[in-house]
Amino acid sequence: ILIKILSHFKIDFSVLHDIDSPKTSAGDRVNSAYSINKTISDTVTEARKAGLNVTYRCSCPNFEIHHQMELPSKDKPFRSWKAVQEQGNVRSSIETVLKELISVCNDIPSNDGTNYEDTLKNWIVLNHKQDEPCYKF
């Protein structure tokens, strides 16, 4: 809804979200978080067609893994903050995506969020996750 409001008022914007896995961890149901990707991608495409500059990035498969943070399920916000403070590679990775999100660029790069499915499929292969039920399409 926020993307549609920004588009209506002709306000350029940036989007960052997790791609997530196509299925739930057991692989027996569609992951609703993954299903939203297409809606976001289509809405961003519409905004661009309307002449807006939209920077669109995705964390594959999620923010923590994308930025090489190993976090427990408990205390994630604090542990994330601590990782950024203490681990240079994590801080650098996050700074890079934040700089992309605030930059003005009319070209659409290969890491654009509209390529989320290909990005995830490549990640699955590179990380040998093909046999995990949640990554089955």
Regions found by a protein language model. Give the residues of each.
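Acidic, divalent-metal-binding catalytic cores of TOPRIM
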Residues: 1-137
